[in-house]
Amino acid sequence: MSITITNPEGRNVEFKDQRGPTCGLYALSFVLEYLYDIKIPATADGDKTRESLRNRFKKDGKTVIGELYDATSSMADYIKALDPSKITCQSVACDVAAIIETLNGGGLCMVPFCVDASGKPDHSGIHAHWCVLLNVREVAGTAVACHWGQDHVFNLSQLEESNKAIKDVEEQYWGKIPAASYSFSIPIEGLNYVQCKTNTDTSCKCEYPLPFPIKSGSIKSIPAKPLSQTLAGKMLVFRNNGSCDENAVSQ
């Protein structure tokens, strides 16, 4: 599933379905093309010779399998370095006023939040996910948010609360299975990932009562992450005017 969004310059940009650990890279890929006409796909779809954000982030030690667990100033600087002549990115405190100011100025916000099963923000502290905020709606305090290849309308106060609720995560294990084997696996690079209970127990973390044909040697460990420090209370803002708001508080 995906949607096509026309930017102010008249370019059509596809926002692809982004689920599982690569959701942040899909969000970033959309932002770079929408604002700066920089076309770097989130993943290479199995072509190891093709440039992708996932390949670059892995090479530079910023991700294990494609997860983006960082909205700090160091990540903002890393993203800017992808193309310093074009990209304006800053880590700022996630609050309604900053979101509205950025969107009204023609920028975009990448906001981490806790997503529920329907795609809306919740306050569980778990299931950290990324959305891209596009523009403020006429209804006060709401904005268009893109994720999962769809556009949604989010209440910004609820989104801010959801962002601040993000909790730390324990060590995770992800293994590869043949593509399209199961509908609940996460497609990455031509194979599918499922979260395993441990690095040796290939039972699905979500308690599905099925054995998994895990590819030998494919299980990757994502270390425990202090998301309450690297994601909660923060967001990444992108502007197309080549300047950052001097009043914004860097995170």
Residues of each region from the PLM?
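Conserved active-site-adjacent core of cysteine acyl-enzyme catalytic domains
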Residues: 9, 51-189
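Intrinsic low-complexity, intrinsically disordered segments enriched in polar/basic residues
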Residues: 1-4, 204-206
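Generic signature of intrinsically disordered, low-complexity segments enriched in small/polar residues
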Residues: 29, 33, 37-39, 60, ...
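Short amphipathic alpha-helical surface micro-motifs
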Residues: 6, 91-94, 216-220
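Low-complexity, Gly/Ser/Thr/Pro-rich intrinsically disordered linker/tail segments
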Residues: 167-251
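Cysteine-nucleophile protease catalytic domains, especially the papain-like/related folds used
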Residues: 2-91, 197, 231-233
